[in-house]
Amino acid sequence: MARYKNIVWDWNGTLLDDVAVGVDTLNEMLGRRALRLLSVEEYKDRFGFPVVEFYQKIGFDMEKEPLHELSLDFVSTYNKYATSLELNSDVPEVLDNIRQIGIKQYILSALREDLLHQMLQSFDIDARFDKACGSDNIYATGKIERGQRMLEVLDICPAETLMVGDTVHDAEVAKALGFGCVLFTGGHNSEWRLREKAPVVRQLKDLERFW
């Protein structure tokens, strides 16, 4: 019998392989402002939420450019690179295997919800999820609050739910919502940071030991 009845997935960095696109986006933004660029390793060591604090740490002047302006810049620049986006390895197979053993699957993302649904449809995996819940803004904020609203309307028992993410913040979200948590090391945070918060996997197909 499965240990969990529900899996709540993060999207960016967990199911979607967008770390390189994210770093390229930030480096273009930094370069236009004559700021120091980031390596992938530096990015994964430093990226976090709230995003405004991360932006400040890597050199953006939030007094000259408030979060709204930087967020618009990030979205438009990210979209230039988005044509190269793919799913992480084994995603369709892992999702199908979970469905076959009767576990319900959901997405909880900081991505704006309409964009999340568009991306799920473009990768033809939207039917694999019972519900996909995203943000109502472009600032990557409010993931815990969105999760709380999700729990209010869906028949999900937190104690029977595992969250799979790729950031320290995903572990914080899982804790706040009462979910179990496993973190994927191939996403937006370094493995050493993730290990301080939850069990980790280096490949999504290795998640099966947690069911």
Model-derived segments and spans:
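A short, structured active-site edge motif that brings together acidic residues
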Residues: 43, 125-141
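Conserved Lys-Pro-Asp/Glu-containing loop-to-beta segment of HAD-superfamily phosphomonoesterases
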Residues: 5-6, 143-171
